[in-house]
Every structure is written in structure tokens, then in C-alpha cells.
Amino acid sequence: MCGIVGIFNIKQQTHELRDKALRMSQKIRHRGPDWSGIYCGGSAILAHERLSIVDPESGGQPLYSPDRKQVLAVNGEIYNHQEIRRRYAGQYEFQTGSDCEVILALYKSLTSDPSRRGENITHEQICGMLESLSGIFAFALYDEERDEFLIARDPIGVIPLYVGYDSDGTVYVASELKALEGQCERFEPFLPGHYAYGKGKVRSEKLKMIRYYKRDWFDYDAVKNNPASADAIRDALKDSVKRQLMSDVPYGVLLSGGLDSSVISAIAEKYSEHRIEDNSQTRAYWPRLHSFAVGLKGAPDLAKAKLVADHIGTVHHEINYTIQEGLDAIRDVIYFIETYDVTTVRASTPMYLLARVIKSMGIKMVLSGEGADEIFGGYLYFHKAPSAQAFHEETVRKLSKLHYYDCLRANKSLAAWGVEGRVPFLDKEFLDVAMRTNPEAKMCGPLPTSPKGEEIFTIEKRIVREAFADMLPEEIAWRQKEQFSDGVGYSWIDTLKKITSEAVTDEQMAHAAERFPINPPLNKEEYYYRSIFAEHFPSDSAARSVNQEASVACSTAIALEWDEAFKNMNDPSGRAVKGVHEKAY
């Protein structure tokens, strides 16, 4: 991961804000410890902290067009950059081997028509440009010649981005809110699948974020009669994983032992021996794939992860942490992940500890299994879905909010140590295949027997299990969903609930809305995390940047209507789903 800071609509001399931009950028240097760069000119400033993964030698940022009239700062990966480079061969003189430079080529093609000189770029043109990108990204582009800017974020929000405003009306964007805290009067998340385009001197008090990412599968009626194919799911995910192995540095996989990470790891192992950039003509820098698991000793995930690693042939690393080590890290974890959401803090802590070990081994990028539960209804509360329509609409809602939760966790807990996380299940092309699959085929369905010969009535993500059963040990292919924060060890969650219930008094909870009028904590654990968050980020904007809603087993609030028992609960653990989880409480 990299980190970016952009400043637009500058009223004073641009150079007067240069030192401020550098200080802001330094706050997110953990995201990109390899190099720093800054552009200061026109009515904009762009700063960049680089984590070099593609083209380490010449891919420093900000990036410039050949005539240096356009400048770009990007946090992201463009997986189809070679295809775009071929398309613009002879039309655009690429300056580096960076995958992100193709964004400049695409933008330049929109402004180079002499007959349209001086005209604004149209919404349709920008949508076409952004839709042509296959990857994860948040970028800020400034056109010095036209005094225009273009800011955009990837469709699902895998890469974080925030936008803020100071009292002078200056506009700021940054990869993390810690760069904006104390600098802006107000700020908010820049919405996934949106862009902002305008003059360097913004006329309104707030950027207009415009949606470019639209899909027919947002609507149940568009998919309800579609076919369902496990083979199509298999082929599309294999293509996604292969695309995302683009790297000029050693990489690995996060392997929890659950279905999703096991599938990603198994596919990655098949391609890891050779470099995908030249169609497997040369061997990879690190031909044997390394896998990583984290948990308390004896945790459910660890034994399963080892089983998968032995089956697929990775070099496996099991990282143990103690409850005390986890507790000691929570204050730092909340600073880096910038949320007080209970599930996210629970799950980010072991991931944060794991990332430190991964970085110490010289690995800069890992693949992870985030997104599958949202796409295929993998959370255990989906067993209660009353209809295919309710099921599908909940998956769409979950995807629309993923940037507040799992995307945030996977990105920021890894980026805290300069490690990039890639998520093949959230690949744009794979999403179209998976979300257009008939929802009936994705609902929790019956199985005749379990691997132990015991009867099982329903299981989640059946179509994914069918698609990849031949690549995994049988007991993994048909293993019940275990949320990451549970799977690292049940005692981790139980201890957090106990300690926070003792640390926060009943009186404090009774007055929670007075201390925290924005998103008042719903329970003592959230109150505990919120208190730490407020020490790091005291502004109202920071508090509003976190999404809050009642939830059972990671459900949205709407899905609480599916089961009468859900209505009086607020517990994000999968063990809260009685009659479904094997160890429900």
C-alpha cells in the first residue's frame, strides 16, 4: 500500500502549504516507507508515500505525463496495465514501468482532441476511463495546463480515501483520516465507486462526488432468473487470483484455514512458481508460496490452516500471540485502523500482529479472502434469510458498506507495517460473475452428510464449496463458517468482552450519549474502543466517519428482521446465531 495527500482550491501561494502537506504525508508514511515525493504547483499539491511493488526502480510518485503538464498520485494496483499500455503504444510515451501510469495515458486521451480543447471532460468519458481500469485504487490527478483535478476511488472501496475542508475552503484528500485530523474543519470518507472532477479553484464549499460504478446486479429483478454455474465461479476466481499475482517483490497468502482463504491460497499456489507478467516464461522471485496463519495456541483456525498448507504445498508459518499481547496492541490498532467498530477491532488486532511478522520476512504483498462472505452470504445469519430476494438484497447492502469494515481492516492493519493486501474475491470482473449468479444457488442449502458422516441440514456458500472441493481437503471444503475474530481463538473474544465490561461502568454506559452524542456506544466493549478512538481522533468528523448499526453475526440492521431472536441482540460474533453455529452461546 502507498499513501497519498492532495490539496486543491488553494487560495494563497501554493508553496506556503508545502510544509503542511509534508507533515500530513509523514503521518501516513507507514503505508509507504520506501520513498516520498511531492508536487507543488498551479493551485494544487500532491504528496506520495510509496510502497514499491511494481517497478521498484523507476516507479516513484507523483507520476508525470511526458510534457509534465499532468501529475498523478495513486495508492493502488492496476492489474490490466499491460493491456492498456499496448493499447496506447505509439500514442503515449510512458515514462516508467509503473502500473499506475496508465491512468495518465487514459486521462490524456480524453483531453488531447484539438476540436474539444477548452471543453470539460464529460461524465460519460470519465466513467469510460474508470471502468477500463481493473484494479484497486484511490488517486488524485491534477492537470496544470487546464487547472483541473480528477479524484476517484475503486468500486468497492478496497483502498481508503478521505476528503476534507478547512475554514478557507481548501480541499484536502488523504489515504487515512489521521492526515486530516486537526487540519480540516470537517472531513468524511470519499465514497467508493465515485469520482470528483472540477477546476483547481473549486467554486462550491463541498466536492460533488459522482457515482461511476453502476451494475445491473444491484437490482434483484435483474438476476433472479439467471443461471448458476460452479464452473463459471471457479474460472472467474482463478482469473482474478492470477491477475492479482502481479508483483516485482516476494508475496504470500493469508491462510486462516477457513474456506475463503484456503481457496485463494490453493489457486495462488498453482500460479506461484512463475511470473504471470510474462505468461509464466520466467520463474518467480520466490518460487515457493509462503502462507501465514495467526491465532492463540490451540485456536480452531491454526490446525485447519496447517492442514490446508500441507495439502496444497505452501511454506507455512504459524504465528502465535497471547491474549496479553493482543490487549497491549489494541490502542495502536485503533490508531492505525481508524475505527471503533467492535468486530473490526477484534479481527484487526491479530491481523496487525501478523503483518509485523510478515514484513520482517521481506514480504510486501499478501492475498487475502475478504469479500466472499458478503458476495455469497457466508455469515451464519444468512441461514435465516426468508427468501432469495432478501438474501440477494442483503449481499448488495453488505458490499456497499464493506469499505467501513473488512476492506478497512484488511487494508489498514496490514498497511500499518508497510504490507499490501489484495482481495481477489472483490475483483471487479469476478464480482460481475458472482453477483449475477442466481441467488437461489447461493442460499444456504442442504447437504447429505458431513465429512464425519453426521447429518448436516444446511451449509453456507455451497456453490463455492462445489467449485473448489477438488482443490481442498474434504473437511475444509465443507467446514462451517468461522468469523476471523472467532477463529483465532474463542478466548480472545471472551476476554475482550470480560475486560471491557469491567473497565466500563454501568454509570458510564447510562451517560454514553452525553459523552458521545455522535454514534453513542451500543455496549461496553464499543464504549471502551470509542474512548481510545476519541483520544486519537477527537473531532466530530472522525466520529461520523465510522458506520454504526445494530448487528448480529455481522448482519446489517435490516436483516435483524429475519429472526425474532435477533431483535434483542447486538453481538457481531458468529456464535450469536443459535441453532446454526456449532458452538453457539
Regions found by a protein language model. Name each.
Residues I10-Q12, D235, S348, H403-L408:
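Short, motif-level signal for alpha-helix interfacial/capping segments enriched in acidic residues
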Residues M1, S204, S360-L367, P386-S387, ...:
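Adenosyl-5′-phosphate
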